[in-house]
Amino acid sequence: MNPNQKIITIGSISLGLVVFNVLLHVVSIIVTVLVLGKGGNNGICNETVVREYNETVRIEKVTQWHNTNVVEYVPYWNGGTYMNNTEAICDAKGFAPFSKDNGIRIGSRGHIFVIREPFVSCSPIECRTFFLTQGSLLNDKHSNGTVKDRSPFRTLMSVEVGQSPNVYQARFEAVAWSATACHDGKKWMTVGVTGPDSKAVAVIHYGGVPTDVVNSWAGDILRTQESSCTCIQGDCYWVMTDGPANRQAQYRIYKANQGRIIGQTDISFNGGHIEECSCYPNDGKVECVCRDGWTGTNRPVLVISPDLSYRVGYLCAGIPSDTPRGEDTQFTGSCTSPMGNQGYGVKGFGFRQGTDVWMGRTISRTSRSGFEILRIKNGWTQTSKEQIRKQVVVDNLNWSGYSGSFTLPVELSGKDCLVPCFWVEMIRGKPEEKTIWTSSSSIVMCGVDYEVADWSWHDGAILPFDIDKM
């Protein structure tokens, strides 16, 4: 075969392959059109099929694109029933770890929000960690000066419990430098306080939509719980403070249904001080253990009935649970009056167990370090000093901070009582450490039928970060 014949032969074969390839593409297009046409989708290539199962578990969302199926499982609650929450609190012999977010450790290299005041609240299908961001990330220049409590950049956001407060999974809830949140069985309600100190406003969101507001009535830093509010049979309750942090202030209980205020009452508490209440449902009422920033090292106790009548006093136990505080041996306790003459304080909690009380406190008497929870026999009703159990959660070599309460609803736990749970904030950075920022992580514990060994589930981040060395 001479050279010209070789060229002609190669050219013919190449042309044949090109024609064959074109025919294959034409056939592929025809088959695709015919197949999609028979599907009855009027020529639309993309469609989303949502199948709702009556299991109140999830929605199965199937996105179909040509011959590719993507299945995404979306948490779902039928939204048709309010949680009861009138059950009694379960009796707890100890507290087991529920979650730990390790946010600051991860934040040395991850995209983690600078936060304070984390807290946990639960719906019938999940628990979420809420937190107040500073509108900045760890190890970033905007984290400078975040020791400040109130700024226009602070927002309430949330993640599923156990997740770090990261930018990829966090959900926006409200603009806020003080907040509370709870679920009534149908939707989440959040209360976010923001604005200037003298004219702050609390915006109530229900199902993610603003539904009502509370304006500052005393003109002195309107603020709320920094922990879960409480919903009973569809109505949700929370406590607000307006006035000085170190002398007599004004206190109110609010009641809302579907995010709209349906009742409020002023709390008469002359000589006493209430703020940052940690509340939970118990036997059809709301029980709160609060912070006295004025004089008491014992904690105020507030019990709220559905008709907004209330009883207010102090935790009777003859052992103090606020910080700073004096020696246990020098404290006598009182059910009605502040004791100890130590101001400032820190947010804390307690759980009634019949006439006993579980109460959390820092291990240090003078600083926010270490954390333990004590069960005091008859401590809810008497000035008893009898400790019948003690459990260490953070050792005294490590920083702690705020702490607060919440419960697992029976829909979530499967029990016939409300499981008592608490969280402990572990503050890092300023003012105790040489950084430009202040942030925190948290450990969450829930009540169990067994005693649990002491251990230290501390924050564990190695400081300073790179940004602190610049």
Curated annotation (Swiss-Prot):
Catalytic activity as recorded in UniProt: Hydrolysis of alpha-(2->3)-, alpha-(2->6)-, alpha-(2->8)- glycosidic linkages of terminal sialic acid residues in oligosaccharides, glycoproteins, glycolipids, colominic acid and synthetic substrates
Active-site residues, Swiss-Prot/TrEMBL: D149, Y402
Region (Hypervariable stalk region) residue spans: 32-86
Keyword Disulfide bond: yes
Ranges for region Involved in apical transport and lipid raft association: 11-32
Membrane spanning residue stretches: 15-35
HAMAP family tied to this protein: INFV_NRAM
Function: Catalyzes the removal of terminal sialic acid residues from viral and cellular glycoconjugates. Cleaves off the terminal sialic acids on the glycosylated HA during virus budding to facilitate virus release. Additionally helps virus spread through the circulation by further removing sialic acids from the cell surface. These cleavages prevent self-aggregation and ensure the efficient spread of the progeny virus from cell to cell. Otherwise, infection would be limited to one round of replication.
Comment, domains: Intact N-terminus is essential for virion morphogenesis. Possesses two apical sorting signals, one in the ectodomain, which is likely to be a glycan, and the other in the transmembrane domain. The transmembrane domain also plays a role in lipid raft association.
Family (UniProt): Belongs to the glycosyl hydrolase 34 family.
Protein name (database record): Neuraminidase
Gene assigned in the entry: NA
